[in-house]
Amino acid sequence: MIFFKKKHDKKLLLGIDLGTTYSLAATVREKSVILLLDKKKRYLLPSVVHYKKNKISVGWKALENITEDPTNTISSVKRLLGRSINFVKKKFPILPYLIEKDIHEGIFFRTNFGNITPIDVSSHILKKLKKRAVLLFNQEIDASVITVPAYFNDFQKKETKKAAVLSGINLIRLLNEPTAAAVAYGLQKLKKGIVLVYDLGGGTFDVSILNLNKGIFEVLATSGDSNLGGDDFDDALAKNIYKKSNLQNRCNDFFQTSLLQIAKSTKLKLTKYEKVEVHFFDWKGYITREEFNLIIIDFIKKTLFICSDLLEEINLSVEQIKEVIMVGGSTRIPLVHTEVSKFFKKDLLKSINPDQVVAIGAAMHVDMLFSSKNNTKNKVILLDVMPLSLGIEVMGGFVEKIIFRNTSLPISKTKEFTTYKDNQTSILIHIVQGERELVKDCISLSRFVLRDIKPQKAGLVRILVTFQVDTDGLIHVKILENYSSKEKKIIIDNNITLKNLNISQILKDSLKHSKDDYYFRVKEEKKIECVRTLEILNKSLKKHLKLISKKELKKIKYTQEKLQKSIQEDDYFSMKNNLQKLDEVSKNFFSLQLKNAIDCSSIKNILKENI
């Protein structure tokens, strides 16, 4: 390993892949990407932290304690970042850690060192990478880009940022992992066309479709599953070994952790060999690659279903995909190669080590961010997208979308709303995220009240709602009430509501219920229109009853009753027809009311002129 004794003139800029199973960092020196190695020339750092009473060890050293002291050795923490206690217990029921609920429904680990959060664990991994960089280059880190899965929600991104702050690393941007991979390949080969990035890591699966053209990387669409990855292969293989071994009477933390480590080791060997001998306590047996393939095939099919749905969503065929980039350690598995290649009907792009490609892309990107503005030769523009639509709740419990899914980032959009009732002095603003029509089927991000609004008639108050989403996907909201200039600004902190987000499932539900949701919304909006019309008409009749004859009033009352009955029966077509009839029979009344208002206004003006 080379150490730089002199302080380097160039800024030290790091691209960091903070992974589920392994983490690594890279930097650009003399137009070449350098992977940061430890003293034993290893570029990978296991994402594992061991906590003793007065000592913390990270990486390979911590990994040695995973079977001996599983309760105090935290691994794959990325899967737990930003998750609630309920989610963790449901999804990972046999974790060996002592997990408890924090005050925000999140989690912390009880360790010999003390109470440790997933943010703390992530920060300790980042500190180790930071130390590696400082030792190697004999200078402090100036800036870094850290990669995250494309489907990390806002809260998970914020927790990643907090981990960077705790580690003392100057983070200037979060970058989607698939986008980083595209940067790594795109800058080398200057690709032009549509590229799909298939990223199967230890804890997450992400797929992104990008349009590459002369240095512009536009993310057309993204999807994935934040709870699908190589760890699931390990769990499934561990269950298979457990069943074969007939050791069901043994079940403690040490036993479970040992079983999982054997499963991981067996999986790695099966990427090279057709048959592997397994020793587990008193049991000895064999696992073949064919058997392993049967265990994991459903997981792989699930990733391909997600790819298929995404292609369908943006009206692309498999034939239109020019290249498929393979990212993530789990793509080393032969069956993954075979099935993905078969699905896309082409050879896969895998010339860059799938473990390294994300860190390489991140290093290239942070280097470009600090390049001279005049040096446009290898400039790249990254256009990421919004993973889910953003909107606010409107009358009837519906969602009015302001920024739609797969909109390029950064983005700022404003939409105007108004009041529903007379003399409102406050308005509840409910911000939601999702693809469904009803608020109850979407994710609640934030609720707050805009107060001290000047009382006015319904529809006269103008409320401007502005959503700004930055390049990291963080959401900034500004609410402005024009008349009284009341304003509120917030940055969304989804500390509870987004913790259990499974975007893949959200999109499936949206497609499944789209027809029913549409018809329900149309019917409910018609009902709201009917109720509002009846309210306005009743108020006008009380005030201007003398303007119409008894015969005309009788017609109006009769049609009102029919419309009221339609509302109670929840019949869309009946509501539509009776509302139309009510408009017809009350047209003359509203004309007389308008004429009367004009006449009264004219009289007032004449009186003013003659006073």
Swiss-Prot record:
Query: Whose protein is this, by species?
Result: Buchnera aphidicola subsp. Acyrthosiphon pisum (strain Tuc7)
Hey, which family's this protein in?
Answer: Belongs to the heat shock protein 70 family.
Q: Which PROSITE patterns match?
A: HSP70_1, HSP70_2, HSP70_3
Could you provide one GO biological process annotation from this protein's UniProt record?
Answer: iron-sulfur cluster assembly
Which keywords has UniProt assigned to this entry?
ATP-binding, Chaperone, Nucleotide-binding, Stress response
For this protein, what is any one GO molecular function term?
Answer: ATP binding
Q: A Pfam family this protein belongs to?
A: HSP70
- Protein name per Swiss-Prot or TrEMBL: Chaperone protein HscA
The family database entries (CDD domains) matched by this protein are listed as: ASKHA_NBD_HSP70_HscA (cd10236)
List the cysteine pairs that form cystine: none
What superkingdom does the record give? Bacteria
Per its UniProt record, what InterPro entries does this chain match?
A: ATPase_NBD, Heat_shock_70_CS, HscA_NBD, HSP70_C_sf, HSP70_peptide-bd_sf, Hsp_70_fam, ISC_FeS_clus_asmbl_HscA
Q: What does this protein do?
A: Chaperone involved in the maturation of iron-sulfur cluster-containing proteins. Has a low intrinsic ATPase activity which is markedly stimulated by HscB. Involved in the maturation of IscU.
